[in-house]
Each structure stands twice: as structure tokens, then as C-alpha cells.
Amino acid sequence: MVFLKKSLLLVLFVGLVSLSICEENKREEHEEVEENAEKAEEKRGWMSKIASGIGTFLSGVQQG
């Protein structure tokens, strides 16, 4: 009976460690996805500012 209890505790411990590792990996992947999304938004922001600046420059050149 003691052997079964120790075995059960060992299995539960290994399962919890495995679950913890999986959760950590999942959290890291989620953070990477969020970082990539933020970088993409930042790039889009810069591109729109550049396009707006070019448009303003070209309209100024055409008027001048």
C-alpha cells in the first residue's frame, strides 16, 4: 500500500511538473505573438506617417 501511495505521488508530481512546463511554454508563445502584433502595428503606423508625408510633399511640389 505504501508503494502505491509513493508511486501515485510520483506520478502526480511528474504530471504537475509537465503541466507547469507546458503552461510556461504556452505563455511564452503568447507573449511572442503579442510582441509581433505590436511590432506590426508600429510598422503600419510608420508607413502611414511616411505615406502622409510623401503625399503632403508631392501636393506642395505640384502647387509650387
From Swiss-Prot:
Signal peptide: 1-22
Annotated GO CC locations: extracellular region
Entry-linked InterPro entries: Frog_antimicrobial_propeptide (IPR004275), FSAP (IPR016322)
Compartments where located: Secreted
Keyword Cell wall biogenesis/degradation recorded: no
Entry keyword Calcium: no
Key words of the record: Amidation, Amphibian defense peptide, Antibiotic, Antimicrobial, Cleavage on pair of basic residues, Immunity, Innate immunity, Secreted, Signal
Propeptide cleavage-removed residue intervals: 23-44
Tissue note: Expressed by the skin glands.
Pfam hit, one: FSAP_sig_propep
GO BP: defense response to bacterium; innate immune response
Sequence positions bearing Glutamine amide: Q63
Top-rank lineage group of the source organism: Eukaryota
Family of the protein in this entry: Belongs to the frog skin active peptide (FSAP) family. Phylloxin subfamily.
Function: Antimicrobial peptide against both Gram-positive and Gram-negative bacteria.
Name of this protein: Phylloxin-S1
The organism of origin for this protein: Phyllomedusa sauvagei
Lineage, opening ranks: Eukaryota, Metazoa, Chordata, Craniata, Vertebrata
